[in-house]
Amino acid sequence: MVVIRLARFGRKKRPFYRIVVTDSRKRRDSGWIESIGYYNPLTDPVTVKIDEERLNYWLGVGAKMSERVKKLSGK
């Protein structure tokens, strides 16, 4: 199953996340198909950017969003 979820990047205690499309059987940070945005919780206010066109494409072909990505995207 294809899922849209967060992949952690950055360094120790300074994380930022990419919003990626990946196979659900893969590990959190490995082997994603496409990066469609990012989330930076360390900025004030929090920075979230998602390519809505690509998000809608992947949802249209059957990808499922994680709970956190649903909250961030507002869908």
From Swiss-Prot:
Gene3D superfamilies: 3.30.1320.10. The keyword Membrane does not apply. SUPFAM superfamilies: Ribosomal protein S16. One of its GO terms (biological process) is translation. It comes from the Bacteria. Keywords: Ribonucleoprotein, Ribosomal protein. This is Small ribosomal subunit protein bS16. It comes from Nitratiruptor sp. (strain SB155-2). It holds the Pfam family Ribosomal_S16. Belongs to the bacterial ribosomal protein bS16 family. GO terms for molecular function: structural constituent of ribosome. GO terms for cellular component: cytoplasm; small ribosomal subunit. HAMAP family: Ribosomal_bS16 (MF_00385). InterPro entries: Ribosomal_bS16, Ribosomal_bS16_CS, Ribosomal_bS16_dom_sf. Transmembrane segments: none annotated. The keyword Calcium does not apply.
